[in-house]
Amino acid sequence: MANRPSLMPPHNETEHSVSRITREGKQLTYKLSVMQQPERARACGAGAKSSADRRPVDPPPVVELRIFESDPANDTQKTDITFAYNANFFLYATLETARPIAHGRVGGPQSCPVLTGVPVAGVAYLDRPSQAGYFIFPDLSVRHEGRYRLSFHLYEEIKDAKDADKDSTLPLPNQIPLSATSKPGIPQAFLHFRLEVKSVPFTVYSAKKFPGLATSTSLSRIIAEQGCRVRIRRDVRMRRRGDKRDEDYEFGEERAAAYARSSDRFTTPDRYAASMDRPRSNSNGSNIESPYGFVPPDRRPSAPDYGFQCPQPYQRPMPPAPMSHSQTPSYQSHLSFGSTPSHYPAPHMPPTPPPVAPQGIYSPQHAYAQIRHPSNGSEYEGTPIAYPAPQIPVERGGYPKPPMSSYAMDPPKPNSYMDPRMPEPSLYPSTPNVPVSRPQTPNLPAMPPPKPLSNDYANHVVPSVECTSPGGSGGGGYDNVRGKRMVYQTGPTYGKRSHEDTFGLDDRSMQNGMRPDTEPYPAYRDFSGESRAALMAEMGIQLSYKRANGKIVMKAPPSST
């Protein structure tokens, strides 16, 4: 540190000049001017990470050097020889406090210098803003906060003997004997101190109180354009004192707003926000996914859309019509909530298709008669051909009367859904019947009068649609469209309990020796997943009889064990 400054501004603040007489009798005048004063700085501290967090003094100090030559007798006529003068110059910067500080008697020297960075600058001869020599200090930092000023010291290395001082006794570089060059310790060049200039006081702030950095000055830009290394900032980094949110950041509100706009632009939009307002369907059948991955395009209107309220607590969907291999299904949805099939479009049939179900509004009993289920006989070996479901008059409780030459018609099963997405029949060969458990009412047996089965069922093949409940196994590997048994089986979905578990088993067929007045339904082999033909072939036709109410009942022979 240089001499302690006084309370009054020093005489060499901002500008200072000094003159000397050379050996040739000429007068040289050196003039230093602080062209760009330091204004603010952020304290970088003295810890281990201080070097990584250094903030330079802003704006960077710039000192101008000019050299004039004149006659010692006439000082008014001076010639600027800054560019023509042959010598080496450098400027050394030191830091001193703007106010004198009274130290104690036992106060030791400072452990580390307060000024850090690059305190030495060489001269740069520039044409702008004017032809002169400039010293730039772009990397000066202060460790502690306070009020300081910079002091710049000019040193010169003389190259020509004619430019040496008149009364100087120091040898010139070209006058040093060559024999002495090999001896260590003998200087080969000498530096001459010329003058000192001081900057105006500036403030060093702590990290929390630092107001920020301003844009680069025009002088810094001009110097940088000529090849000097000066940091240029084209945006304002000043921070408002009342804004506590940006205390720990260097950019202000403008940069924060720009950052927020850029972050909002890359935010992923919420595509599912509007799906929360979608009204819920009247059925829970849509919650069950299909195992085949086909989703119909849209949903068929439910029963309230037709103005018809279904009286049953559980509503039954309508099965789809079978389609040919070369046609696209024209149905709208796999859901039907007990409504009539009047809006069900006619399916595409093979050549010469029979007429489809007539249009019109039907009662719920007619809707029951239109539902098809797995038929008996040799449906696994025949080619699946689509037949429309005939209208059957309803008798006694809404159960259809079974025809002698058609497939069975069953009453509706509660809480069921259908799956129109089926694979091609050629992909799955015919396999033996696999028993599958299904917690719903078994199909009402529809059997012809006692006679050989091959005469009635062998030549009649009807594709059937199997309706399963959400609590069931979802078809048990049965092709609902083609009428084929599939190799694989789908797992149970574990849904609601069936209608029989709640309201009893009165409508179920009597099997394994059961009687209507005996104990509840015992544990037995579940034939609901098998075809009627396989069941009758296993039990025998002689055990089938008609009840008094007109129902055909199959009775298992008594067990031999």
Curated annotation (Swiss-Prot):
Role played: Component of the velvet transcription factor complex that controls sexual/asexual developmental ratio in response to light, promoting sexual development in the darkness while stimulating asexual sporulation under illumination. The velvet complex acts as a global regulator for secondary metabolite gene expression. Controls the expression of the penicillin gene cluster. Positively controls the expression of the class V chitinase chiB1. Positively controls the expression of the transcription factor atfA. Required for cell wall integrity and controls hyphal branching.
Gene that this sequence comes from: velA
Subcellular location(s) per record: Nucleus; Cytoplasm
InterPro entries (alphabetical): Velvet, Velvet_dom, Velvet_dom_sf
Domain Velvet, chain residue ranges per copy: 25-233
Polar residues bias: start-end ranges: 324-339
Protein name: Developmental and secondary metabolism regulator veA
Domain notes: The C-terminal PEST domain is a region rich in proline, glutamic acid, serine and threonine residues that is required for the light-dependent regulation of development and secondary metabolism.
Compositionally biased intervals (Pro residues): 347-357
Start-end of Basic and acidic residues biased regions: 12-23, 258-268, 497-509
TM region positions: none
Family: Belongs to the velvet family. VeA subfamily.
Chain positions of motif Nuclear localization signal: 39-44
Keywords: Cytoplasm, Nucleus, Sporulation, Transcription, Transcription regulation
Taxonomy of the source species: Eukaryota, Fungi, Dikarya, Ascomycota, Pezizomycotina
Region (Disordered) location: 1-23, 41-60, 258-361, 491-524
One Pfam family cited in the UniProt record for this chain: Velvet
GO biological process: one example: sporulation resulting in formation of a cellular spore
Gene disruption: observed consequences: Substantially down-regulates penicillin biosynthesis genes pcbAB, pcbC, and penDE. Up-regulates expression of laeA. Leads to light-independent conidial formation, dichotomous branching of hyphae, and pellet formation in shaking cultures. Decreases the expression of the class V chitinase chiB1. Decreases the expression of the transcription factor atfA.
Assembly and binders: Component of the heterotrimeric velvet complex composed of laeA, veA and velB; velA acting as a bridging protein between laeA and velB. Interacts with kapA. Interacts with vosA and velc.
Domain of life of the native organism: Eukaryota
